[in-house]
């Protein structure tokens, strides 16, 4: 009996050991096979950075700080040229923004060992992120990354870091219960506006500290493909949180209640960048959103001068809907309104436990 017990323990221990070894091998394969699809470009001497007072110029592009304190960026060319110009013009701002972001993470995770584990987890989680970001935007991010510091290479290469940072808004969803994300927006048109024109308003509440919000950037893009557009963000951010293109199409995003994502997909700001650059109508915006899988839930308020109205694209990792208004106004906070999502358990929980319905009611009063 004693011998049988010893054999049982021995074989069980061997089995557990082999299972652990197989798991370690599997995780190692995932980790070392992670591919962010780093572009292969050789920088060219396209020009010289010229700086006078508050104006910086490089290869026909410029960055200046206006009297309001906002930074204004104008870039043109192909994707890599745009990214390279952004990097050359704003290298100090890129460093400041990244330092503030990493310092904020260090406050939350002060242990270097935990930070190393966090990096390991992010590599595993976002191992296929490159596949979910269109090549044009990867090229632009790569151009920017050439001017980024190597001080934080323990997190990843400059390109890998900049690509991952574009998930910052999405990662905020995981902290939504802590009120890092809570936006409000509205649109009104027809008899509800003084001159019958389409009016869009929004409040962007994504808080990562006062230092993170110190350098606000208004970017004016003249891409070789698609429409010219303007967007508001921060240095290094090529995704769109709020913006308008030359056809009069506007985009604003509002977080919705999400389950914790289990795998990487397209960051929501990259999806809305694609919409802003390539859509002129609500239907075109919807078609672009339909072809991309996102890993968080979001409401995207689309205003269209050509359509003369606005609508909300409600999107989750599993499904999508277009919510329209029967009247001349539409309101968007942080819960879904369409028949597709209205009765979902997560949406009902969000309505019951967040301030989203109260902000919605306040916008109705205004």
Tell me what each language-model feature is:
Residues 5-38:
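N-terminal type II signal-anchor transmembrane helix
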Residues 26-153, 190-199, 203-232, 237-366:
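C-terminal, well-structured catalytic/ligand-binding subdomain of enzymes
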Residues 144-201:
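Gly/Pro-rich turn-and-neighbor structural signature
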């Amino acid at each position: 009996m004693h011998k049988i017990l010893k054999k049982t323990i021995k074989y069980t221990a061997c089995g557990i050991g082999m299972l652990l070894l197989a798991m370690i091998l599997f995780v190692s394969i995932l980790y070392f096979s992670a591919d962010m699809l780093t572009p292969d470009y050789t920088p060219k001497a396209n020009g010289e950075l010229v700086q006078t007072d508050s104006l910086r110029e490089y290869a026909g592009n410029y960055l200046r700080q206006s009297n309001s304190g906002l930074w204004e960026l104008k870039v043109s060319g192909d994707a890599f040229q745009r990214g390279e110009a952004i990097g050359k013009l704003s290298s100090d701002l890129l460093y400041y923004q990244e330092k503030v972001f990493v310092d904020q993470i260090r406050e939350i995770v002060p242990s270097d060992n935990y930070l190393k584990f966090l990096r390991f987890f992010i590599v595993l989680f976002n191992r296929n992120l490159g596949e979910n970001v269109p090549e044009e935007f990867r090229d632009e991010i790569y151009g920017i990354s050439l001017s980024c510091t190597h001080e934080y290479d323990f997190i990843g290469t400059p390109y890998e870091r900049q690509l991952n940072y574009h998930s910052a808004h999405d990662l905020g969803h995981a902290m939504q219960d802590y009120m890092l994300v809570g936006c409000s927006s509205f649109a009104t048109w027809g008899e509800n506006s003084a001159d019958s024109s389409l009016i869009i308003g929004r409040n962007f509440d994504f808080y990562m500290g006062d230092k993170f919000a110190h350098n606000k950037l208004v970017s004016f893009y003249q891409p070789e493909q698609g429409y010219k557009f303007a967007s508001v963000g921060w240095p290094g951010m090529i995704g769109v949180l709020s913006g308008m293109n030359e056809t009069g199409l506007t985009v604003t995003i509002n977080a919705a209640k999400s389950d914790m994502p289990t795998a990487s997909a397209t960051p929501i700001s990259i999806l809305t960048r694609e919409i802003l650059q390539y859509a002129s109508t609500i239907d075109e915006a919807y078609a672009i959103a339909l072809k991309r899988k996102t890993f968080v839930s979001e409401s995207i308020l689309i205003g269209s001068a050509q359509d003369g109205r606005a609508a909300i694209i409600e999107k989750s990792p599993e499904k999508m809907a277009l919510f329209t208004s029967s009247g001349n106004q539409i309101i968007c906070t942080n819960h879904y309104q369409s028949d597709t999502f209205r009765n979902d358990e997560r949406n009902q929980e969000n309505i019951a436990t967040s301030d989203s319905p109260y902000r919605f009611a306040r916008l109705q009063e205004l």
